[in-house]
Amino acid sequence: MFRMIQSLTPSLYDQDTFDTHFLRDMRKARYSIIIESPFIRLARIEQFLPVFKRLTSRDVRIIINTRRPDEHDTRYRTQAIIAIQLLQEIGVEILFTIKHHRKLAIIDREIIYEGSLNILSYYDSCEIMRRITSKAEAEMLIDFIKLNKFMEVK
């Protein structure tokens, strides 16, 4: 009759505090990480690459949804192509969505980060990211962004 409602535990981060918390959560991932970032910058990928390598070696599935490289500005297009190749070489799955502009991450179908910060291209701007721990919210978000079909067990 009564069901326990999982409480949301939100935290807010800015451009100076986001990476520390996000990297900590990623390192603890056991099953999967979804990152939606419309743009990809090579320097930013190089920051995350060691963590991604460790995760994929532990069979943590990483899915990145981004724009196609030809939708990047000319000066970033080549960077995006190189970065995507580096990611694919270590087993990261790349999805492309035309006109993509969402900025979010979902770790182990439970931890959500969402806000204004482009996770894979951030450089120098004023940003905000909210962290929420909720399996129900994560499942709703995965369904909403239509990534359930990519999250099936392989």
Where is each model-derived feature located?
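HKD (HxKxxxxD) catalytic microenvironment of the phospholipase D
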Residues: 33, 92-138
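Short acidic active-site motifs
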Residues: 21
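A conditional alpha-helix N-cap/helix-loop micro-motif detector
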Residues: 14-15, 44-45, 94
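Acidic/glycine-enriched edge-of-secondary-structure segments
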Residues: 1-16, 34-40
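Cysteine/selenocysteine-centered motifs that mediate thiol-based redox chemistry or coordinate metal-sulfur cofactors
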Residues: 139-154
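Conserved beta-strand termini and adjacent loop/short-helix elements that scaffold enzyme active sites
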Residues: 13, 65-67, 97-99
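Primarily the HKD phosphodiesterase
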Residues: 25-88
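A short, polar/proline- and glycine-enriched secondary-structure boundary/capping micro-motif
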Residues: 46, 75-76, 123-127, 150-154
